[in-house]
UniProtKB/Swiss-Prot annotation:
Region (Disordered) residue spans: 473-590, 1171-1221, 1488-1566
Key words of the record: Disulfide bond, EGF-like domain, Extracellular matrix, Glycoprotein, Growth factor binding, Phosphoprotein, Repeat, Secreted, Signal
Keyword Phosphoprotein: yes
Family: Belongs to the LTBP family.
Gene Ontology annotations of biological process type: elastic fiber assembly; hormone secretion; transforming growth factor beta receptor signaling pathway
Name this protein carries in UniProt: Latent-transforming growth factor beta-binding protein 4
Chain's gene name: Ltbp4
Span of domain TB: 286-338, 406-458, 1223-1277, 1391-1444
């Protein structure tokens, strides 16, 4: 999956750098290409290509690699996206030197197609033997010395400027990562050629051997290109072969090479600047450059290195964004060259001559290897297990070139690996790219970035790796030179005839072969021979050329990671010319004449019987006598070059002398160099002694030999002995040292303290001197102080303090003290340390008759104010409240300064403006009180209202209010009292009249007023408001309609109040009161109540249920496959074919009593519950190896098909003493009581460890089972957990029946069902399976996050729970929610339906087209209801199932306790690889498609803990991996348990097949949109089954109505059921209550005198109030 990048995919752009055609036919199709001046330097071959890669891509071997997509090649004449590939210009070497030529090339910046590029390539074919170009950018300004800039990697368009490695500074009209987007309002620029800029590129040829003077060949090119195009060339390698000028076959081969998708045989090692989010300077890794010319860095080494590793190796500069020269290079560059010029690299000038530098003596080179000095350089010798890297300056571990491939995981969670990339790669690529977090099938963690483990496998730093082809060239022996190739003629005596120059035997260097298998290379076209006059023999295989000393190094050709060989550029047409190696028949002279080179390096001598060879010096005749072979002089004993190293050469040998030796007069000997005779001598300050190959420095006392042994260096005694000078400082001297003592110490080692107190005069003056170590301390008297240790006592100037100690005075300092001089009005204190004020007011005569007020330094006189009087010379306040009652009797006096204040009582107030007594307020004069129905009367402190008749004073007494006589008195009996303003009136009914007082209604006695004539012969009986004519009946009877006397039912006529708290029973002519019993109880003869046992009649609940008597009631517990009827007194069959939609798939569903069957229409097909289709019958047991006997299919547990054999041949199981015998198998061995955790006592090692066992042994001597990732486990259990290998047949496997092997130990308190592989443990309702304890444990429903008892208190019980409510709340019908009996049902009201609830429980998106009831909203449309945002129950909860009458997703079990259903709760029986799915509040995995669209509910109900773990199901398949139990094993669909086989749906609007989930919508959409895919007319005309769901059936469709609705077949809609009318009279729905029908349900309203009980729809007599 390609990660979306900024700006989308890169557009295709081809940038071609083509040499200009010299012929007339070389016109360019591109519009006005810019000319480029190119300097062509002969005698060298080279080519160049520069790749510019898109963002998040890096160039690698002329390929742009993106971590998020597949590798895209960057071959010649191709460019993709923001990549820019400059097409290389091939060239051919010149056979002879000629002056530099200049020509023109065209740089075409127009986007071209591949066909246009190929046509342009044909027209711009390079002509001439010396055409080639090198590019290198010249920066616009010179960088400071010692700091070179790495070019900015981004290509900024539309005039943008690259300011950071990942940022472009755009002009105002453009935006985007690369300034490629037009801002709002900006118009796109007109298409035009962008401005051109010129860059100059100058670089040496890489992999080119310097000549004997050490000067590299340099080339320069001037290039004009747009400003947004950036060219970065770090290194240029030579072209492998030349081109011929006018050879059609060579042009054809070049065209074929241009069409190839692989890279050319020359490469440009280009690298882009790193991204800031990948690594930074702080990471310590950067680029290492091997060349530094001026302020520019060039020739970077592949990979990343630290600055230390780079600078101590071959690097000259290092950096990430800026490259900094190494310190050692700066020192060398700053040295002044001698008179003879600079020395070549690796040499230094000593006494006017260049001497080899021993790089190994400086240390820090050849990391992980041993440094060996060579002339002009050094080499690294790597130990076993290490290889030379591509820079040949350090050794890297062989672990970095491991080619083992495995999955690379990008996510780690809870110790598991997930989200692997789409292909298997090596561990180095996975971890060094920092894309992967773990690698391999065993989930091996990648080492942390920057750790030692990371540096071991990623020595090149992050983002780079080594391949085997990169290092294969460096694994040759140390003394072996790179392969060389010569184009010169082999040496032969001058007299021997030579073939023509064009016929010289030559061979193009071939790339090194790859060890792995490779396809056959393309056949190379035979070169066209030049015309000649005499016939030529048939060409034969060309011999291997002999290396020559002066030959050029053979360029290395590294194969690509793929097995396809690199395409080659053609060679010039040179006919092959070789001689035969086998003598031919004929005269010998003709043989020597026909083939003068038949002897090789010798002369052919004809003989009568053939010929022989006269070999050149250094060669001898071969074993067959027909060819001269080289003599290896180095194999002679003794060796000819001791003590040097002998190197054999064709026809001779040479001696390579080691360090400390030099070649003697003869080339075959090495003489010792006497280093001691050098001027100046090498041993500074010492004596030099020469040794073979080296020298030794004898140093005097105080000196020691330097680490390199070439001089004597001073011994730093101060560093060797840190405590040499004690408290002093050790100062090193040449050959010695001295101690510098601090103040207060003396002696040679500063060990003697100086007693300063003994000196004269004493150092402390007036103080006491105390000597201390190295100093002294002064104890000063008062008025003196010391500034610290070693300081004398000095006088303290108290007058300089702030504030001054002499306030109001002048301070004068004295020796050790001070004195104060006070002004007038002040006097010094007793101590004389400060000035005190003189209080003149102490003299009473100072202010006669006035108050004296003292002030600092003076005083003043003033008279007393009002309310004050003079007391003892002071003005004091007069307390008016203490004399009399100034506020009167109704006020409280409060004294104030100079006056007083009166606080008056309510109804009183003080006079305004001045203090005075409180007077009464006349409210009748100030307010409109008591009006209009009363009169105001003032009282002392208040007032009263005298109201008119029919009125009374109000609550506050300020007004008169009307009296409602009708509500306060029992007026107008038998009439209606109507209140009037100030009175009332009685409205009497017919038959009544008002009384004399007009306050009551009296009955009119018609019998008395109208006399006996009113009823004739019958008796007139007056009644309230009327009368009647009746016969005379006995008491307790009344006349009937036919003139009879009928019994009066006093209990019905007078109600329950006739008997109070007892129950009324009617009797003939009377009634009686008996004690009351609740429903379900019956009275006893003694007056008590006892329970009625409804289950005494065993057929009370019918044939499919068991009657369970309860106190005051009963319960019918239905059998499996049945559900309770509406009346609760019998059970009816569940039609699974209707409730489980599409349960049989393509088969026909047939409902049977208590279950159902899936019948296939075509015989003899069988129904497969896993696929939901009818399939041909399976093969009988025993047909295939390892198959098990097939159990007959049953509705309870569908049989699973036998697992096929694994796809690969497994290794044999581990044999040995460990697996022999039978012992005990243990589980949970980490527990403290592991010895008691025994699964079985007589099992084998394989049976225990290949199942759920963790240890095996006897007597608690437990041997741990091997880990699943170990080789021992793979050998013991080759087919994985749950399978054993039958004896004698390693290719077969046998499933282990854990339920039979471990009996009840593996599924305690549950039902164990064997599966293949593994087993399933079915726990009772209210229990869940504990995977570690291997048993069913009770689930604490009260501890779940969702409240089990809504509005009440939850009490957990074993296997269940019950809810209690606080009065006046009662339990509803579900027994799981507390409701108020007086509250109105939610479904009686219509409200707004909210379609979405946010994470903060805020309702949004209301349904605006209609309002809905609570049930309609939650079941059909939304997530919350009403203005209070009442949340709907979760769709995977029991409440939702009960509310909406829906079948939950099959991945969940049946309803929890509290209703009718199956007595076992089943979790999803998910087999591998879907077992052990992690879930929780922070991590919900995607649903197990196609079964469950919702995250698992909280608590352990949602799933069964599988005994065998497996990787998470969301991991994509690997290219070469199967599942954990074989590729052909698929997970079983979830099972609903006994009688409920299930398959994934394949109909529209239902559960799609796994492969159809992405095309037909998710399972969530199938549940939330049940009408999707159905036509409108298929579900009727009323919006498709209102109050129900549209269900497909084989005959078409039908409506499945919700509870409380029934199907009206005429309208195909669900109509409300009136439960109140359809209830049977003998079994009413509401007991002691009135039934009220609602939409889809009903509710009960208790009758007067009755209250609701804990039983639903039951009301009991209310208790009388005390």
């Amino acid at each position: 999956m390609r990660r979306p990048g900024l700006g989308g995919p890169c557009p295709l752009l081809l940038l071609l750098l083509l040499p200009a055609a010299t012929s007339a036919s070389g016109s360019s199709p591109s519009p006005s290409p810019s000319p480029i001046e190119k300097a062509v330097v002969p005698s060298h071959q080279a080519g160049v290509a520069a790749c510019h890669c898109c963002l998040d891509q890096t160039p690698k071997s002329s390929r742009c690699t993106r971590a998020s997509c597949r590798v895209r090649n960057c071959p010649p004449a191709k460019c993709t996206g923001l990549e820019g590939c400059l097409t290389p210009t091939p060239s051919v070497p010149s056979p002879s030197r000629s002056p530099v030529e200049k020509s023109q090339v065209s740089l075409n910046w127009q986007p071209l197609t591949l066909q246009e590029a190929r046509a342009l390539l044909r027209q711009r074919r390079p002509r001439g033997p010396w055409a080639r170009a090198l590019l290198k950018r010249r920066p616009p300004h010179r960088a400071p010395a010692g700091q070179a800039r790495v070019l900015c990697p981004l290509i900024c368009h539309n005039g943008g400027v690259c300011v950071k490695p990942d940022r472009c500074l755009c002009p105002p009209d453009f935006a985007g990562k690369f300034c490629q987007l037009h801002s709002s309002g900006a118009r796109p620029p007109a298409p035009a050629m962008p401005g051109l800029t010129r860059s100059v590129y100058t670089m040496p040829l890489a992999n080119h051997r310097d000549d004997e003077h050490g000067v590299a060949s340099m080339v320069s090119v001037h290039v004009e290109h747009p400003q947004e195009a950036s060219v970065v060339v770090h290194q240029v390698e030579r072209v492998s072969g030349p081109w011929e000028e006018a050879n059609p076959e060579a042009l054809a081969r070049a065209e074929a090479a241009a069409r190839a998708e692989a890279a050319a045989p020359y490469t440009v090692l280009a690298q882009s600047a790193p991204r800031e989010d990948g690594y930074s300077d702080a990471s310590g890794f950067g680029y290492c450059f091997r060349e530094l010319r001026g302020s520019e860095c060039a020739s970077p080494l592949p990979g990343l290195r630290t600055q230390e590793v780079c600078c101590r190796g071959e690097g000259l500069a290092w950096g990430v964004h800026d490259c900094h020269p190494c310190a050692e290079h700066l020192r060398n560059s700053n040295q002044v060259s001698g008179p003879n010029g600079p020395c070549p690299p690796g040499f230094e000038r000593v006494n006017g001559s260049c001497v080899d530098v021993d790089e190994c003596a400086t240390g820090g080179r050849c990391q992980h290897g041993e440094c060996a000095n060579t002339r002009g350089g050094y080499t690294c010798v790597c130990p076993d297990g290490f290889l030379l890297d591509s820079s040949r300056s350090s050794c890297i571990s062989q672990h970095v070139i491991s080619e083992a491939k495995g999955p690379c995981y990008r996510v780690l969670h809870d110790g598991g690996c997930s989200l692997p990339i789409l292909r298997n790669i090596t561990k180095q690529i996975c971890c060094c790219s920092r894309v992967g977090k773990a690698w391999g099938r065993g989930c091996q963690l990648c080492p942390p970035y920057g750790s030692e483990g990371f540096r071991e496998i990623c020595p090149a730093g992050p983002g780079y790796h080594y391949s085997a082809s990169d290092l294969r060239y460096n694994t040759r022996p140390l003394n072996q030179d790179p392969p060389r190739v010569t184009f010169n003629q082999p040496r032969v005596p001058p007299a021997t005839p030579r073939p023509p120059t064009g016929f010289l035997p030559t061979r193009r260097p071939e790339p090194r072969p790859d060890p792995g298998p490779q396809p056959e290379p393309r056949p190379r076209p035979e070169p066209r021979p030049r015309p000649e006059s005499r016939p030529r023999p048939e060409p034969r295989p060309r011999p291997e050329p002999r290396p020559q000393p002066e030959s050029q190094p053979r360029p290395e050709s590294r194969p690509r990671p793929e097995s396809q060989p690199w395409p080659e550029f053609p060679l010039p047409s040179i006919p092959a010319w070789t001689g035969p190696e086998i003598p031919e028949s004929g005269p010998s002279s003709s043989m020597c004449q026909r083939n003068p080179q038949v002897c090789g390096p010798g002369r052919c001598v004809p003989r009568p019987s053939g010929y022989t060879c006269a070999c050149d010096p250094g060669f001898r005749l071969g074993p067959q006598g027909t060819r001269c072979i080289d003599i290896d002089e180095c194999r002679r004993v003794p060796t000819p070059c001791a003590p040097g190293r002998c190197e054999n050469t064709p026809g001779s040998f040479r001696c390579v002398c080691g360090t400390g030796f030099q070649a003697g007069p003869r080339a075959t000997e090495c003489l010792d160099v006497d280093e001691c005779r050098r001027v100046p001598p090498p041993c500074d300050r010492g004596r030099c002694e020469n040794t073979p190959g080296s020298f030794l420095c004898v140093c005097p006392a105080g000196y020691q030999a330097a680490p390199h042994g070439a001089s004597c260096q001073d011994v730093d005694e101060c560093t060797q002995s840190p405590g040499l000078c004690g408290r002093g400082v050790c100062e090193n001297l040449p050959g010695s040292f001295r101690c510098v003592c601090p103040a207060g110490f003396r002696g040679s080692a500063c060990e003697e303290d100086v007693d300063e107190c003994a000196q004269q005069p004493p150092p402390c003056g007036p103080g006491r001197c105390d000597n201390t170590a190295g100093s002294f301390h002064c104890a000063c008297p008062a008025g003196f102080r010391s500034r610290g240790p070693g300081a004398p006592c000095q006088d303290v100037d108290e007058c300089s303090r702030s504030p001054s100690p002499c306030a109001y005075g002048r301070c004068e300092n004295t020796e050790g003290s001070f004195k104060c001089v006070c002004p007038t009005g002040f006097q010094p204190n007793a101590a004389g340390s400060e000035c005190e004020d003189v209080d003149e007011c102490e003299n009473r005569l100072a202010c006669p008759g006035q108050e004296c007020v003292n002030s600092p330094g003076s005083f003043q006189c003033r008279a007393c104010p009002v309310g004050h009087h003079l007391h003892r010379g002071r003005c004091t306040d007069v307390d008016e409240c203490s004399s009399g009652t100034p506020c009167g009797l109704h006020g409280q006096c409060t004294n104030t300064k100079g006056s007083f204040h009166c606080s008056c009582s309510t109804g009183y107030r003080a006079p305004s403006g001045q203090p005075g007594p409180c007077a009464d307020i006349n409210e009748c004069l100030e307010g409109d009180f008591c009006f209009p129905h009363g009169e105001c009367l003032n009282t002392d402190g208040s007032f009263t209202c005298t109201c008119a008749p029919g009125y009374r004073p109000g609550p506050r007494g300020a007004s008169c209010l009307d009296v409602d006589e009708c509500s306060e008195e029992d007026l107008c009996q038998s009439g209606i009292c109507t209140n009037t303003d100030g009175s009332f009136e009685c409205i009497c009914p017919p038959g009544h009249r008002a009384g004399p007082d007009l306050a009551s209604c009296l009955d009119i006695d018609e019998c008395r007023e109208r006399g006996p004539a009113l009823c004739g012969s019958q008796r007139c009986e007056n009644s309230p408001g009327s009368y009647r004519c009746v016969r005379d009946c006995d008491p307790g009877y009344h006349p009937g309609p036919e003139g009879t006397c009928d019994d009066i039912d006093e209990c019905r006529e007078y109600g329950s109040a006739i008997c109070g708290a007892q129950r009324c029973e009617n009797t003939p002519g009377s009634y009686r009161c008996t004690p009351a019993c609740d429903p379900g109880y019956q009275p006893t003869p003694g007056g008590g109540c006892q329970d009625v046992d409804e289950c005494r009649n065993r057929s009370f609940c019918g044939a499919h249920a068991m009657c369970q008597n309860l106190p005051g009631s009963f319960q019918c517990v239905c059998d499996q496959g049945y559900e309770g009827a509406r009346d609760g007194r019998h059970c009816v069959d569940v039609n699974e074919c209707e409730t489980l939609q599409g349960v049989c798939g393509s088969a026909l569903c047939e409902n049977v009593e208590g279950s159902f069957l899936c019948v296939c229409p075509n015989s003899p097909e069988e129904f497969d519950p896993m696929t939901g289709r009818c399939v041909p019958p399976r093969a009988p047991a025993g047909t295939f190896p390892g198959s098990q006997p097939q159990a007959p299919a049953s509705p309870s547990l569908p049989a699973r098909p036998p697992a096929p054999p694994p796809p690969r041949r497994p290794s044999p199981p581990r044999q040995g003493p460990v697996s022999s015998g039978r012992r005990e198998c243990y589980f949970d061995t980490a527990a403290p009581d592991a010895c008691d955790n025994i699964l079985a006592r007589n099992v084998t090692w394989q049976e225990c460890c290949c199942t759920v066992g963790e240890g095996w042994g006897s007597g608690c001597r437990i041997q741990q089972c091997p880990g699943t990732e170990t080789a021992e486990y793979q050998s013991l259990c080759p087919h994985g957990r749950g399978y054993l290998v039958p004896s004698g047949d390693l290719s077969a496997r046998r499933d282990v029946d854990e339920c039979q092997l471990f009996q009840d130990q593996v599924c305690k308190s549950g039902v164990c069902v064997n599966t293949a592989p593994g087993y399933s443990c079915y726990c009772s309702n209210g229990f869940y399976y504990h995977a570690h304890r291997l048993e069913c444990v009770d689930n604490d429903e009260c501890a779940d996050e969702e409240p089990a008892c809504e509005g009440g208190r939850c009490v957990n019980t074993v296997g269940s729970y019950h809810c209690t409510c606080e009065p006046p709340l009662v339990l509803d019908g579900s027994r799981r929610r507390c409701v108020s009996n007086e509250s109105q049902s939610l479904d009686d009201n219509l409200g707004v339906c909210w379609q979405e609830v946010g994470p903060d429980l805020v309702c949004s998106r209301p349904r605006l087209d209609r309002q809905a009831t609570y049930t309609e909203c939650c079941c059909l449309y939304g997530e919350a209801w009403g203005m209070d945002c009442a949340l709907c129950p979760a769709q995977d909860s029991d409440d939702f199932e009960a509310l909406c009458n829906v079948l939950r997703p099959p991945a969940y079990g049946p309803p929890r306790p509290g209703g009718f259903g199956i007595p076992y709760e089943y979790g999803p029986d998910i087999g591998p690889p879907y077992q052990s799915l992690p879930y929780g509040p922070d991590l919900y995995p995607p649903p197990v498609l196609p079964y469950d669209p919702y995250p698992p509910p909280p608590g352990p109900f949602a799933r069964r803990e599988a005994p065998y773990g497996a990787p998470p199901f969301d991991m994509p398949d690997f290219e070469d991996d199967g599942g954990p139990y074989g590729e052909s094993e698929t997970p079983d669909p979830p099972s609903r348990g006994t009688g409920w086989p299930y398959r994934s749906r394949d109909t529209r609007g239902s559960f799609p097949e796994p492969e159809e989930s992405s095309e037909r919508g998710s399972y969530t959409g199938a549940l939330s949109e049940p009408y999707e895919g159905l036509e409108a007319e298929e579900c009727g005309i009323l919006d498709g089954c209102p109050h129900g769901r549209c269900v497909r059936v084989p005959e078409g469709f039908t409506c499945d109505c919700f509870d409380g609705y029934r199907l009206d077949i005429t309208r195909m809609s669900c109509v409300d059921v009136n439960e109140c009318d359809e209830a049977e009279a003998t079994s009413p729905l509401c007991v002691n209550a009135r039934c009220v029908n609602t939409d889809g349900s009903f509710r009960c309203i208790c009758r007067p005198g009755f209250a609701p009980t804990h039983q639903p729809h039951h009301c009991a007599p209310a208790r009388p109030r005390a």
